[in-house]
């Protein structure tokens, strides 16, 4: 799992049937997680722009969609309530 910040949205009117009704967000991993990267993640938690979120990748992201056959590779699975209380040593 990664900690990332929501920096944008993606609008896709045509998509795989497993993803109909899903909201897509652009997230950027935090520098403390290593090299920063931007990903498109399916929002399972109702995140908004500027939120710090937990992002599941791979099979963990697919499990969140409710279908192992989903084409999901990244999913927002949580919103961090108190970002200032994250401790990284």
Tell what function each PLM region has:
Residues 1-3, 43-44, 81-82:
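OB-fold and OB-like single-stranded nucleic-acid-recognition modules
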Residues 1-32:
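N-terminal first-folded block
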Residues 30, 35, 55-57:
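Conserved RNA-binding domains used in RNP assembly and mRNA/RNA metabolism
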Residues 37-41:
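Short alpha-helix capping/helix-loop boundary micro-motifs
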Residues 54-56, 60-89:
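C-terminal structural segments of small proteins and small subunits
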């Amino acid at each position: 799992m990664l900690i990332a910040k929501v920096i944008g949205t993606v609008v896709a009117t045509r998509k795989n049937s497993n993803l109909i009704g899903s909201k897509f967000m652009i997230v950027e991993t935090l520098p403390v997680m290593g090299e920063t990267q931007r990903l498109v993640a399916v929002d399972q938690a109702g995140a908004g722009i500027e939120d710090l979120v937990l992002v599941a990748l791979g099979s963990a992201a697919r499990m969140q969609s409710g279908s192992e056959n989903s084409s999901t590779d990244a999913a927002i699975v949580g919103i961090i309530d108190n970002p200032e209380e994250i401790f990284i040593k």
